[in-house]
Each structure stands twice: as structure tokens, then as C-alpha cells.
Curated annotation (Swiss-Prot):
The keyword Transmembrane helix applies. It is found in: Membrane. Keywords: Membrane, Transmembrane, Transmembrane helix. The chain crosses the membrane at residues 34-54. One of its GO terms (cellular component) is membrane. It is a single-pass membrane protein. It comes from Dictyostelium discoideum (Social amoeba). This is Uncharacterized protein DDB_G0283503. The keyword Transmembrane helix applies.
Length: 57
């Protein structure tokens, strides 16, 4: 059971990395850096919360 949840966390993390890199490719202008950071935070923070929640179970 724990192994399956670790596998799902790993796949979620790789999906998040793909989303972040696609956002960064889409915004090549320097004034989009703030928007990029916001988008990265929106993607990464829920993932970290999910990892923390699963780790407590």
C-alpha cells in the first residue's frame, strides 16, 4: 500500500515538472518571471501538501 502511494507521488511530481517547464517555455520574456513563479507555486505547493498528507498516513 505504501509503495503504491509512493509510486503515485513520483508520477505526480514528474507531471508537475512537465507543467512547470511548459510554462517556462511559453514565457520567454523577462517581465513574465513573476507570473512564472506564481504558476510554479500553484503547481508545486499542492504537490508538497499531498506528499506531506500521504507521509502522515
Amino acid at each position: 500500500m505504501l509503495f503504491k502511494s509512493l509510486q503515485s507521488i513520483t508520477s505526480v511530481n514528474s507531471i508537475q515538472k512537465n507543467q512547470i517547464s511548459s510554462v517556462s517555455v511559453g514565457s520567454s520574456q523577462s517581465n513574465n518571471n513573476a507570473a512564472l513563479l506564481d504558476a510554479a507555486a500553484l503547481v508545486v505547493i499542492p504537490g508538497l501538501l499531498t506528499v506531506a498528507a500521504v507521509a502522515h498516513i
